[in-house]
Amino acid sequence: MTITQLEYVVAVATYKSFVSAAEKCFVTQPTLSMQIQKLEEDLGIRLFDRTKHPIAITEMGEGIVEQAKNILAECEKITELVQAQQEKLSGVFRFAVIPTVAPYILPKLLDQYAAAYPEVKLHASELETDQIILALSNGELDAGIVSTPLEEKHIREYPLFYEPFVAYFAADEPALKKRLILPSDISLERIWLLSEGHCMRNQVLDLCSDHVEGLQSGRPYRYESSHVETLRKMVDNSGGLTVLPELATHEFPEDYMERIRYFEEPMPVREVGIITTDHFVRMALLQSLMDEVSKLIPESMRVQKKGRKVLRIQSAKL
């Protein structure tokens, strides 16, 4: 049994295909198949049911695959521990950011980080929270920037900042007459929401928890978007309102800002944090990323303050 064989096993289990696994491992498919077959012969069991499409893990193979993942994670720790003790910031660091945060930090963060740490190669991507958690567990990512708290098993969380939510109204909405608004001013009949799968959608529904009936019933069609900027454009073109993270407004022109309203205390905020698996040890690299993100965030958001309410991510409503 070799580490390489275990890597091939985990790859096939992840991608459910010998061809895709070979591509990800940068070897030919016959080479990968031969090594897995040799391991199966040594163990005296079949790890995969090759008659099914996609490839399925056998009942005996399930436990072997999980143990292989654990062994590979422990092997990776050896290199990481050496780097941590040497305090040498180098190598590849793979992280992903959720779509409602990425546009407001990634463009500046990547160049800023590269200038500060030229020996570290960042691999950044944009994924939804569930995809980030899966990629972390599969060893495809080192960290993720998401809305927290998640309270997921085997996931560690490190808060980064607390971002207020604001409301953006069409020019004819009566709530614009107020300086500060209440959650009851958010009409779910006329709201534009992110689609299911986005944490921010659940947070907005949590904000309006006392009156969730009649979602988008005030118009002849229902539309939900995957992009915050699209929500703003729907308000501009079709009226109504939406709820935005404050960072999304920082480059708004003055006429857009006139239609932004903040909430009365307790001001609704989202906690944004960085997450890793519980076996991650490259803490110096993680801290360097956290430090660079912090430089991009207004000081007022860096700590949780009185008069703010962190909205829940999980919501049973709608």
Q: Could you say what each language-model-derived stretch is?
A:
Residues 10-28:
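Short helix-boundary/capping micro-motifs
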Residues 128-141, 146-147, 197-260, 307, ...:
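Hydrophobic hinge/microswitch elements
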Residues 152-159, 163, 178-179, 185, ...:
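Beta-alpha-beta core module
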Residues 190-213, 282-291, 297-311:
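Secondary-structure junction motif
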